[in-house]
């Protein structure tokens, strides 16, 4: 029962998929970050279904771009937008953290979101779907969430409130780090074996950038920054996927 509740907590928080309602507590939140990557598997499965449907190229690309938003409910895009606003303010650390808490969407957030979707859609039009590509992208979506959860359990927090702090405080950090580190390592090996080493490098590069920016600009990570990382990792891995196909590696 605890295992199912733990999975339900992850899906309730990080997806728009309906799950049974129950009280969240220390037990069912302890390993919720370990279940977070499962959402990537669901998105990847839906992505593969879209890939095999007999749709026109542009319609298929639109499906590829919209599936992650539909399944997650846009929670990570919200963090991406808020973080873009904060970084574009060029204010001090306290000012940036205040902007992250502001529920309004600023001009820079709108510009970055439009640019993000345009780039994502353009890359999706370049994807030539094959079973190998489908499996590789499923692994990529799981990997980015494993790295995100690993960061929440490992990186310093910027503040003592918020989503990331709540899950980090409730988590058995040692166990979560071990599980997600092993999972991430296995995924990296699997992706490289499929010819997706460029996707692995892209994800790890964005993770390094995430750590550097969060420490320098915010003094640690927040839930918004976690969403910013996930969206950037996804975009750059998608670009790497297209590059691999264009280069004849897939």
How should each PLM-predicted stretch be described?
Residues 146-180, 217-222:
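Solvent-exposed interhelical
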Residues 34-83, 135-139, 196-216:
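Membrane-embedded alpha-helical segments that form the functional core of polytopic membrane enzymes
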Residues 9-12, 26-51, 165-169:
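N-terminal beta-alpha supersecondary unit
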Residues 18-24, 75, 95, 149-159, ...:
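C-terminal ends of transmembrane helices
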Residues 67-105, 214-233:
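Acidic (Asp/Glu-rich) catalytic motifs at the cytosolic membrane interface
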Residues 29-47, 86-132, 136-137, 174-190, ...:
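Multi-pass membrane catalytic core of lipid/isoprenoid biosynthesis enzymes
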Residues 46-54, 67, 71, 124-127, ...:
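Alpha-helical membrane-inserting segments
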Residues 1-24:
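Membrane-proximal soluble regions of multi-pass membrane proteins
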